[in-house]
């Protein structure tokens, strides 16, 4: 996964 502030990815 990528380092992001998303609830779903």
Curated annotation (Swiss-Prot):
It comes from the Eukaryota. Its main location: secreted. The keyword Secreted applies. It is found in: Secreted. The modification Phenylalanine amide is found at residue 9. Coiled coil: none annotated. Belongs to the NPY family. This is Peptide tyrosine phenylalanine. It comes from Loligo vulgaris.
């Amino acid at each position: 996964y990528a380092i992001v502030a998303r609830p779903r990815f």
